[in-house]
A protein has these predicted regions:
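Catalytic nucleophile-loop/oxyanion-hole region of alpha/beta-hydrolase
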Residues: 75-84, 95-131, 254-262
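Mobile cap/lid helix-loop segments that gate and shape the active-site cleft of serine hydrolases
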Residues: 33-37, 166-201, 207
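Short beta-strand/loop motif that positions the catalytic acidic residue
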Residues: 211-213, 217
Length: 276
């Protein structure tokens, strides 16, 4: 059983420590260096955690959300816990992952995400979620992590995925250079590039997918999402793909994003339409 850091009453956040002793792979960041600020920006994570925001009237669905931050840090508020209320309102339990950065160890973020899925599965009864209705999602680099888990699942294969302005590929031509360099290093092998280029790993087994992105994203080229969309369609994967004309990158962090309410409505309608 996972170690519960703050066992609080139902419908209040519950935080789990991901690893009881030590993680399989260290990212080389010493304990005690973690920093955070009032915006929810977190850096130097060495002890990853999973914080669950249970729905008061749960439908059984849970979404594991991986905040973005370019594989350097985590936007844990705006791309994490801020989504709890709209999801809880439709019965979806939100779980926000505070994952470790690679720091030269590309396998580390995926290890944390796989472990988080195992915890949600193990604690499903207590959290009132259906093990068959656990999905994964993320924003920006967190979207890359989510899609990577879909491409290379562990013991628990997510039932669906939700991606906001995601990094999808490690192809140098149209990847996000910062995320690529921090995940794979300056001179990654072709095998490593291929492994982490998620548009190359779509199959008929890929679960239903929701993607929301802006056409004028200056940080992550739109081709990340359009190539992924084409691969999903080619493999007959149900996909809901939303491209907004403006918004740039990171608009979950922008309360003035013109399509913010529309995005949340489209997401919640999609989740409900799939019985989630």
């Amino acid at each position: 059983m996972a170690q519960v850091i703050n066992p609080i009453s139902a419908a209040e956040p519950i935080t789990y420590k991901l690893w009881q002793n030590s993680a399989p792979t260290s990212n080389g960041i010493a304990k005690g260096l973690e920093q955070s600020d009032s915006t929810g920006w977190i850096t130097f994570v060495s002890e990853p955690e999973l914080t669950v925001y249970p729905a008061t009237q749960p439908s059984g669905t849970a979404l594991l959300l991986c905040p973005g931050g370019g594989y350097f840090g985590l936007s844990s508020l705006y791309e994490g816990s801020a989504l709890a209320q709209p999801l809880n309102e439709i019965g979806v339990t939100l779980a926000v992952l505070k994952y470790r950065m690679p720091n030269g160890h590309h396998e580390v973020p995926r290890e944390d995400a796989l472990r988080a899925l195992e915890i949600l599965n193990d604690e499903a009864s207590e959290l009132k979620i259906d093990p068959e209705k656990i999905g994964i999602g993320g924003a920006s680099a967190g979207g890359h992590l989510a899609a990577t888990v879909i491409s290379h699942p562990g013991k628990i294969a997510p039932a669906f995925q939700v991606l906001f302005y995601p990094v999808i590929t490690m192809n140098e031509e149209f990847s996000h250079s910062g995320s690529r360099n921090l995940l794979l290093g300056d001179k990654p092998s072709e095998n490593l590039i291929e492994y982490f280029s998620n548009e190359l790993h779509v199959s008929s087994e890929t679960p239903p997918t929701f993607i929301a992105v802006s056409q004028n994203d200056p940080a992550v080229p739109l081709r990340n999402s359009t190539d992924y969309f084409r691969a999903l369609v080619a493999n007959n994967v149900p996909v809901s793909f939303h491209v907004y004309p403006t918004g740039g990158h990171g608009w979950l962090c922008n309360p003035d994003f013109a399509y913010r309410n529309q995005t949340l409505t489209e997401l919640t309608n999609w989740l409900v339409s799939f019985g989630r």
